[in-house]
Amino acid sequence: MYTVIPTARFEKDIKYYIKKKRYFHIGEDIRQITNELQQGHLVGTEIPGLKISNHGHIFKVRSINTDTHSGQSNGYRILYYAISEELKIYLLTIYSKKDDNNIPSDGRPSCPHPRNPYKM
């Protein structure tokens, strides 16, 4: 079993969607994905060329947003970092596909910490 650890950025993103966007079912919507990750199923697509270290891989996975009634294609995107040797998965960020214009064009999620954007 993997340990799934939400980063401070991920928790901040969740709070934003609950408070500002009023997506009250976000926890239920992503629960299936976090359960899969705990079982060691690295769901989603690996993002090549985006590395934090040589020991892990970054993935992007789609999730439904039941608050918008628009399915997975316009649902959430979750970026996570998997370290197989340590059996740990760090949830990096979550964003709504409807808000993807807030994601920088170079493909990196915006982060407040300039040296290590995924400080854990």
Regions found by a protein language model. Name each.
Residues S73-I78:
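Short, surface-exposed coil-to-beta transition loops
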